[in-house]
């Protein structure tokens, strides 16, 4: 059992949604993803004037076009789950970034990847300089879903 807490993000900074898992090479959410997504639904219900972008990212494996399509389908999968949970579609934007926005290492990443340094950018070129085990850890870090607050005025000015 684990607890998921999402601080309401500043408008300029994306927030990683921990524990979102997809079937390999697919956009289907695994059952293990529901806890984190249910917490996000609660956060959105507590903040009804917020609109967000759900951003999905891939590792560098596969070609750019394929990764962009896969990440878009994954972001849409999260949006569908949130809509089923009662969140208005108007408040949600799905965006797949493929491998175009590699993760920049921060203090949180260092907890699971202490061989990295804060500020490292997990590009394909950088990752290929690491050991095979470290490469897989970095690829897993790049395979992520984040949300970013777009507006805090939804429904205020009708």
Which residues are covered by each model-predicted region?
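Periplasmic peptidoglycan-binding/tethering modules of Gram-negative envelope proteins
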Residues: 1-51, 90, 108, 112-113, ...
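Conserved phosphate/oxyanion-binding catalytic-loop motifs
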Residues: 54
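Periplasmic OmpA-like peptidoglycan-binding domain that tethers envelope proteins to the cell wall
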Residues: 57-158
